[in-house]
Amino acid sequence: MKNKLILALLFCCSFHNLSGQNIQSPSPWFTVNEVLPRVWVIDDHKAVNIYLVIGTDSALLIDTGMGAADLFTQVRKLTAKPLIVVNTHGHVDHAGADYQFGKIYIHAADSSDARACNLPESRANAAKNLLGRAVPQPADTYKKQEIHSKFVAVKDGYIFDLGDRHIQVIETPGHTPGSICLLDKGKKLLFSGDNDNTAVWLFLPNCTPLSVYYKTLQKLSGRLSEFDLLLPGHGIPKKNDFILDQVECVKSILNHTCVSEPYETFAGKAQLCKYGQASVAYNPDNL
């Protein structure tokens, strides 16, 4: 009954009006809510979700956001436990504050991108693009701090041991070659980065062919019994069967039955295919 109540809350509400605890952020840049017991979402200026999972022995920070404000201090307001930091992939909106932490776990295929996006000008440009406007410049925004972090490669099956919680890496190439999801099997949660957003971007220059992403979705669809909730990098939580709509969406692109429509953002032009709840923006030349 408790799990059903949590599910109902998650799917009827956004992160910003859940009944979980919220706290005053030390920076006006962030909004912070405890969306499940000892699972915090740090909303990075309404552009991306950063997750903090707190175990009995240590805590796991999943992604670091745009790097536009003092994330380290924000995290330390939530927990004093030893901190592990992992990137779901190497894009600047997910790895932009890596420079604030000493060690970053990331798939080897994305580590060079994560390092490159931590240049101060990269962080500034990304925030401006994502927010669609000039970004305010408080004292803690866009420090000209270079990155000296150590990147440590993780592979499929790697386990982050937090004490009472064990978070498993699942390789999910598609949005980037080194994308990963993070499975909290004990709590039946999947932290999915940009793999399972409402609209998944598969048209960027470093995206894998769509056929590779299709295999990723098939892999996850075979593991639906291991998680009930998807906690994505953008937007609100989704039920696990959202992945089934994604499978059908991509299948319809690959078999040329989808009636797509033009799609354009600051990142470029694409075609958009929709199926059920899912949408995929893709490059017709990269199937």
Question: Where in the sequence are the language-model features?
Answer:
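Active-site-proximal loop/helix segments of hydrolase catalytic cores
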Residues: I170-N206, L210-Y214, Q218
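Active-site neighborhood of phospho(di)ester-bond hydrolases with catalytic His/Asp-centered motifs
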Residues: I62-T64, L83-D93, Y105-A108, E171-G174, ...
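Active-site environment of divalent metal-dependent phosphoester hydrolases
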Residues: N49, G67-D70, G90-G96, S111-D113, ...
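Active-site HxH/HxHxD metal-binding segment of metal-dependent hydrolases
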Residues: A68-D161, T198, E248-S260
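Metallo-beta-lactamase
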Residues: N22-I23, S27-P37, A109-I170, K185-G186, ...
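Accessory terminal helices/loops
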Residues: Q21-N22, K215-L287
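Bacterial Sec-dependent N-terminal signal peptides
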Residues: M1-N22
